[in-house]
């Protein structure tokens, strides 16, 4: 059985309609009308222990509703969720001790006190043994390089350092599952790299299962091999990022610096042009692997240098949204 099993969950929100004109508030009071929003519809997926999964989609797609159900905040109208033999909203007390949540735009740290004081409070909330807490804290301090910042009031920390402390707070009780919502929002390139490397480390060291929701596709590319795409409340794609690229982003540009001449007429060649100091090929990677193509070229000409355009993940996702009309 999978570590996370989501089966046919649905959630509809009832939203009151506002009347227009004079006495609209009074009219609404006596004759209130509603509209119904299907936030998620028949959503099903499973996740293995230790997986990092990117859960993506445009605004209003149903990502947040799904995460709130998985974290036990919301109860679905129908369907079921089993995570590590627990149902989030039924086994809430036990379940919340096994999950960590990081929201990029919301803080679980107390603003006016040092992060270490928040960590100490979380120790009591989660009832962590003194020795275990000390071990966990030292590990997080070392991995995230927190030694010089945990005694500074949170409001005085840079956004990057604050986010590192947020992640430490979410992991202080050694959760089995980590929900990350926009964990690198607003961070500079260096801070993003630190956060991503840390997520990889704790996933590898502790087999923490990670569900990542973000609009920053570079996070997805750096961390997740598998993505689940949701749009208009429905799962539209569930598979590997590499497979998605092959299906929707299959043209690759390869620029070769060489003094030799070459012309190919194979079915995988989309176009070929002479450029300054060399040749430029556009190939269809559904028909030939890049490594295989380079091996072939190397056997025919002398290569001085080579540049491979790996494609733009943001453009790929935009194209995906357009194809699915979401």
PLM ranges: what are they?
Residues 23-28, 120, 124, 132-149:
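Conserved ABC ATPase "signature" region
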Residues 174:
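Conserved catalytic motifs of ABC-family nucleotide-binding domains
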Residues 79-90, 94-95:
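Conserved ABC transporter NBD signature motif
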Residues 178-182:
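Catalytic Walker B motif of ABC-type/P-loop ATPase nucleotide-binding domains
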Residues 196-284:
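ABC transporter nucleotide-binding domain
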Residues 252-326:
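Short, charged/small-residue-rich alpha-helical element at the C-terminal edge
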């Amino acid at each position: 059985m999978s570590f996370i099993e989501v089966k046919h969950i649905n959630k509809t929100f009832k939203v009151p309609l506002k009347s227009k004109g004079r006495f609209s508030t009074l009219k609404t009071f006596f004759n209130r009308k509603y509209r119904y929003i299907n936030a998620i519809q028949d959503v099903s997926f499973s996740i293995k222990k230790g997986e990092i999964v990117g859960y993506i989609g445009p605004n209003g797609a149903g990502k947040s509703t799904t995460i709130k159900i998985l974290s036990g905040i919301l109860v679905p109208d129908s369907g079921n969720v089993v995570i590590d033999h627990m149902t989030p909203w039924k086994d809430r007390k036990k379940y919340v001790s096994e999950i960590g949540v990081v929201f990029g735009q919301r803080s679980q740290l107390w603003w006016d006190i040092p992060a270490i004081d928040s960590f100490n409070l979380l120790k009591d909330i989660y009832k962590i043994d003194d020795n275990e807490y000390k071990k966990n804290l030292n590990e997080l301090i070392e991995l995230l390089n927190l030694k010089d910042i945990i005694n500074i009031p949170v409001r005085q920390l840079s956004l990057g350092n604050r986010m590192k402390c947020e992640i430490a707070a979410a992991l202080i009780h050694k959760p089995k599952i980590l929900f990350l919502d926009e964990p690198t929002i607003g961070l500079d390139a260096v801070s993003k790299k630190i956060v991503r490397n840390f997520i990889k480390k704790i996933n590898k060291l502790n087999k923490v299962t990670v569900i990542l929701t973000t609009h920053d596709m570079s996070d997805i590319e750096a961390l997740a091999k598998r993505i689940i795409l949701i749009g208009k409340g429905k799962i539209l794609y569930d598979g590997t990022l590499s497979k998605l690229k092959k299906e929707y982003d299959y043209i690759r540009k390869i620029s070769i610096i060489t003094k030799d001449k070459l012309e190919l007429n194979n079915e995988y060649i989309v176009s070929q042009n002479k450029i300054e100091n060399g040749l430029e090929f556009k190939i269809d990677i559904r028909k030939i692997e890049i490594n295989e193509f380079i091996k072939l070229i190397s056997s025919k000409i002398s290569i001085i240098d080579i540049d491979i355009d790996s494609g733009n993940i943001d453009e790929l996702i935009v194209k995906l949204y357009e194809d699915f009309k979401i």
